[in-house]
């Protein structure tokens, strides 16, 4: 039998043991919760990066709108559509989407209600997104994005093109089956990562690959042949240039370092971003990791050249000499001297990382003159980035020069300094471009169309001396 003193001591020791066990259990629970929270935060952070890779914010944010709340006007060949609200708002956004719903929308272009989204969303490329990347992006949109109760705008498309059910047929006809994740057949892991970035989240082919009769991207990878990344159709009256290794009109004269710097800052010594690519750099690629930029560059430099005309010859100095003598009655030369030479120089070399060269520039000598004509008429903006914080604006000349004068200077630049671009731009071409938005050429579409126009926001404030650029480049920069 235990005496009272012994019994009390045992009870006291048992209580102390219970307290210690409870404390240890509480610490374990707290540690587990903290560890889970850290894991969740890491997943959200990873998802934010994947969303940057995919450039979601550029399309799903209206000019001066709230991030990811949609409302961006996109003028397609069949009518106007508006990007949707992808914040976690349960009524107007995707707050009620499960991970399965989210995955189906990204990879198949099918909404929670079963309707097919318009292929302005690059879901054929997003089908390449890995399970881990989709899971991370879902965590970001559900827990890292502020919900915005903004109702989606209805598309402005005439019947019968407004019907969505044919989009399922379009998907079946033109969207190939994709294997998610990195292509395991590529032996070099860095090149494989670059291929994944270019053809998956980066969806580069949406602009840099020509389109077919159904307005579909002609090729989603090297299996598509020479069309793949060989230069796109008119989108916002900009022609995305070839990303193949062609010396004249592609990346043949670019180094890997050039590509990395271009994607990070928007400018290198011999080129600068223009049109929609300004948005891509501002919103997406400047935020990519150095390893991902290097992988992208390495993959692009692995791409072979495709057959092309001889659009660049040897500069014999005659263009520079003509300009040094005042143009001597050459209409295009005189327009150039009075409006262009102060930045792009008489020898067409420009100023490194400020005013791109015109001599040998792929944008100038490419077969389709639409981009050059568009920047002459409407101007352009070199956006500020973290690594190159200065913005540079080129004014448009549509209110200063006649259509004939703009045509003259475009033709002059396409034939000067050894440039040997084909064709001639007329005053009528400029007039249509300026007033109706019709591209000078529609070769990339295989159809007569003004192409897509996505009025994109830019990360500029009202206090800048130029109005915020739109994806059309119609920014009226001062």
Curated annotation (Swiss-Prot):
PANTHER family: ALCOHOL DEHYDROGENASE CYTOCHROME C SUBUNIT, BLL4482 PROTEIN-RELATED. The modification Pyrrolidone carboxylic acid is found at residue 37. One of its GO terms (molecular function) is oxidoreductase activity, acting on CH-OH group of donors. Inactive ADH is produced under conditions of low pH and high aeration, where the bypass oxidase activity is highly elevated. In spite of having 10 times less enzyme activity than active ADH, inactive ADH is not distinguished from active ADH with respect to their subunit compositions, molecular sizes and prosthetic groups. It seems that in inactive ADH, an improper interaction between subunit II and subunit I/III complex impairs efficient intersubunit electron transport in the ADH complex. Heme c 2 binds at residues 204, 207-208. Heme c 1 binds at residues 56, 59-60. The gene is adhB. Residues 42-145, 189-304, 327-417 form the Cytochrome c domain. It is an enzyme of class 1 (oxidoreductase). Optimum pH is 5 for ubiquinol oxidation activity. This is Alcohol dehydrogenase (quinone), cytochrome c subunit.
